[in-house]
């Protein structure tokens, strides 16, 4: 998997969409700050520089749209597992939000690249490590 580390970006998901043709089958982009982070249904993801883990993963090897949407569940459960290993008790507000002590600390946004068939899946994760 190719790793791309950036200081600042509009959106890690949007970056992967723009660069799709130039990237290998799997890629991950991280940024210290996003200027236009977003969640589902166009909700704004507020973030401050160096206070969040911001990353998006590109997987080009999806061919069925129904499999692509399972990535939300997989990513959400993976973050819960990571937090559990650090003894942080978190809960899931399905389908894509993670809470600790009643505060949202993580959002996951899965998007597809269609042209016109499914060409890839992008999984964006924003984790507020200071909440």
Give a label for each model feature.
Residues 81-116, 126:
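Acidic (Asp/Glu) carboxylate-rich active-site/surface patches
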Residues 10, 35-36, 100, 127-129:
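Short, glycine/acidic-enriched loop or turn micro-motifs at the edges of active sites
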């Amino acid at each position: 998997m190719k790793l791309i580390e950036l200081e600042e970006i509009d959106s890690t998901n949007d970056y992967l969409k723009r660069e799709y043709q130039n990237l290998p089958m799997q890629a991950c982009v991280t940024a210290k700050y996003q200027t236009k982070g977003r969640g589902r249904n166009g909700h704004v993801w507020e973030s401050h520089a160096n206070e969040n883990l911001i990353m998006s993963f590109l997987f080009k090897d999806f061919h069925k749209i129904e499999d692509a949407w399972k990535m939300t569940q997989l990513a959400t459960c993976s973050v819960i597992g990571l937090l559990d290993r650090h003894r942080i008790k978190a809960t899931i507000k399905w389908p894509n939000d993670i809470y600790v002590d009643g505060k949202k600390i993580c959002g996951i946004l899965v998007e597809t690249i269609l042209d016109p068939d499914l060409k890839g899946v992008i999984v964006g994760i924003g984790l507020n490590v200071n909440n």
